[in-house]
Design a protein with these regions (language model features):
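Short intrinsically disordered, low-complexity coil segments enriched in acidic
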Residues: 1-2, 226
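Intrinsically disordered, low-complexity regions enriched in acidic/Ser/Thr/Pro/Gln residues
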Residues: 2, 8-189, 193-196, 200
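Short hotspots in intrinsically disordered terminal tails
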Residues: 6-7, 284
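Feature captures the catalytic cores and cofactor-binding loops of soluble hydro-lyases/lyases
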Residues: 202-281, 287
Length: 287
């Protein structure tokens, strides 16, 4: 690899302009010691980023859409292109945001093109996109809602919510031996454990528990419990499967919260140490 490529400099067009920050302010409900507290909190920002690649004589082509925290987008794009084998460091000539004037302010910061000196080494799943480019969190949420399974509203007791992480942990032998796997579990609204699966990938663990019900043609329990944080794609899986509540020991992202609220899903994070924070559906949590 040509190490000089890292020091010669690459054109980064528009990255100094104002863009979404890494966190957003939100109103949440904290449950602690039998009390409810409405307060403001900070949530990590999550937005889709469309990655494109262009080279002389060809229009830019979309190669991926990834979820990320805004900031250092050009670094993300350049690193991703090299790591995926699409190009080498020496062939990256410029990185820029989409500048279509018809786009909203947030949309134009969610599309990045990496201009290469010549054709890419490979182009996985490449396809042309329209000139009216743009991708934003609102559109992403609406796309998921269009595929959502109908679900009945779920009501949970505070005591049940507080007990769920421990009930999940009881069925995590892999974590007990290694500390290196995630877990997902499906539970009834009264806290009855139905199925728990582990995997090195939290997304895979969710696929496994949902798949276990699909393959046995059994009813889908309404509550999904996660051992880590809640990203957009995990809420997407829950909504598409018709689940009514997500409970996690970690924090959610901004786009995950938006989708949960739009879909009418109860979302609980930081469920540990005798407390938790409700980001969506707090009105369906009873004492």
């Amino acid at each position: 690899m040509d190490r000089s490529a890292y020091s010669r400099g690459v054109s980064t067009i528009g990255e100094r302009r104002r863009r979404p920050g890494p966190t957003v302010r939100d109103r949440v409900t904290e449950f602690r010691d039998g009390a409810r507290l409405e307060r403001e909190d900070r949530v990590i920002t999550e937005e889709p980023l469309e990655l494109r690649v262009g080279w002389p004589g060809r229009p830019a082509e979309r190669v991926a859409v990834t979820m990320r925290t805004p900031g250092h987008d050009f670094e993300l794009a350049a690193g991703w292109m090299v790591h995926e084998g699409i190009t080498t460091p020496r062939d990256v000539r410029a990185v820029r945001y989409c500048t279509d004037e018809t786009l909203g302010e947030l949309e134009e910061f969610n599309v990045v093109t990496v201009d290469l000196a010549g054709p890419p080494l490979t182009l996985p799943a490449a396809r042309l996109v329209s000139s009216a480019c743009g991708v934003c969190g609102t559109d992403t949420v609406q796309d998921v809602l269009a595929r959502a399974e109908a679900t009945d509203p779920v009501t949970l007791s505070v005591a049940t919510v507080l007990a769920l992480p421990d009930r999940l942990r009881e069925q995590q032998p892999g974590f007990g031996r290694t500390g290196g796997v995630h877990a997902a579990g499906l539970f009834e609204a009264d806290g009855t454990r139905v199925v728990v699966r582990e995997d090195v990938g939290r997304h895979n663990a969710v696929d496994k528990v949902v798949g276990s019900r699909i393959l046995t043609a059994q009813r889908m329990p309404p509550v999904l419990v996660l051992s880590g944080r809640i990203g957009f794609e995990l809420v997407q899986k829950a909504v598409v499967s018709g689940l009514g509540a997500l409970v996690a020991v970690g924090a959610p992202t901004s786009l995950a919260v938006s989708l949960a609220r739009e879909a009418g899903v109860v979302m609980v994070g930081f469920d540990r140490g005798g407390r938790f924070v409700a980001y969506a559906g707090a009105e369906r949590l009873r004492d």
